[in-house]
Swiss-Prot record:
Domain-level remarks: Each subunit can be divided into three discernible structural domains: the lid domain, the nucleotide-binding domain, and the C-terminal dimerization domain. PdxB has a unique dimeric structure among NAD-dependent D-isomer specific 2-hydroxyacid dehydrogenases due to the presence of its dimerization domain at its C-terminus.
Catalytic activity: 4-phospho-D-erythronate + NAD(+) = (R)-3-hydroxy-2-oxo-4-phosphooxybutanoate + NADH + H(+)
Gene name for this UniProt entry: pdxB
The organism's taxonomic lineage, starting at the top: Bacteria, Pseudomonadati, Pseudomonadota, Gammaproteobacteria, Pseudomonadales
Protein name, entry field: Erythronate-4-phosphate dehydrogenase
Keyword Oxidoreductase attributed: yes
InterPro entries noted in UniProt: D-isomer_2_OHA_DH_cat_dom, D-isomer_DH_CS, D-isomer_DH_NAD-bd, Erythronate-4-P_DHase, Erythronate-4-P_DHase_dimer, NAD(P)-bd_dom_sf, PdxB_dimer_sf
Active site: R208, E237, H254 (proton donor)
Family listed: Belongs to the D-isomer specific 2-hydroxyacid dehydrogenase family. PdxB subfamily.
Amino acid sequence: MRILADENIPVVDAFFADQGSIRRLPGRAIDRAALAEVDVLLVRSVTEVSRAALAGSPVRFVGTCTIGTDHLDLDYFAEAGIAWSSAPGCNARGVVDYVLGCLLAMAEVRGADLAERTYGVVGAGQVGGRLVEVLRGLGWKVLVCDPPRQAREPDGEFVSLERLLAEADVISLHTPLNRDGEHPTRHLLDEPRLAALRPGTWLVNASRGAVVDNQALRRLLEGGADLEVALDVWEGEPQADPELAARCLIATPHIAGYSLEGKLRGTAQIYQAYCAWRGIAERVSLQDVLPETWLAGLQLNPGCDPAWALATLCRAVYDPRSDDAAFRRSLTGDSATRRAAFDALRKHYPPRREITGLRVATGGQAELQRVVRALGAQLV
């Protein structure tokens, strides 16, 4: 097999070395010419895999190490008989860790008690569904809007987007980017909806940049709108709007799901799909390539405050403010310089582990145990 992989996909050799020759390119450089002699294509969301790129190529399998598939022309895949796989849920936990870090930063700035907020989660799939589980596990009030899932689960606890925007004072977006169809999500939060948000609302977008009208959001913030905003995704990536970023509390270069586990899990999942497509046995597993965590565990004093424990456990693993600082330093120079810096921050992202790998002792204190379980850490 002739395999072409995005150079930023990790451990490709560990999984695919015995399957043929492997060539690597930057994801944004993968085009029609690059696919002339390729059987298997492994990509991330930065590569548009379209009819124009694939027509006439020998590509027969496409794997994307992402949850979303809006960069894949699935209609053409079906027409051309091209097998494909995404990696659903691969980085979901990393995104949840990111959102929790943003909420802690917002609470610190606002002097707010996270337990007293009402949370609105838009999109309850792989990422949003996990976030809902964590928030409800902590005992917090959560509203969920997901029209496609509501249609499949008519007895589920769902609300309309209008009700969610009216009642929630924390909104976290986790939808795919759908430009058409029954439930389009491009500019789901457009100028009228953004302008109608309650004063003091916190908004987190770690889904796709165009789910929020970036220009409308910038105008509102420039006009003094009382919002706290955390953006990990941007319209026109890798070109992020520096003026919008300057008005966000947290601004990062599409790294919410960049946990080490998430990256390796994505490669493992497309390898599993590839093996199924070829009808061969899997030779390597995720556990074969996942290194030991740097922080083995934490011991909480049974008398500590649960809110302090929550913040400490989350930040022991990840604090998005470090990524925010690095991103802001990159928002200088001309457009080409900023675009290159955006991709460089992603390419050279430092190892970051998920909270699920953290072992926590609580001395048997029930409320602390509830926090640990809700976060998904390992209770010992």
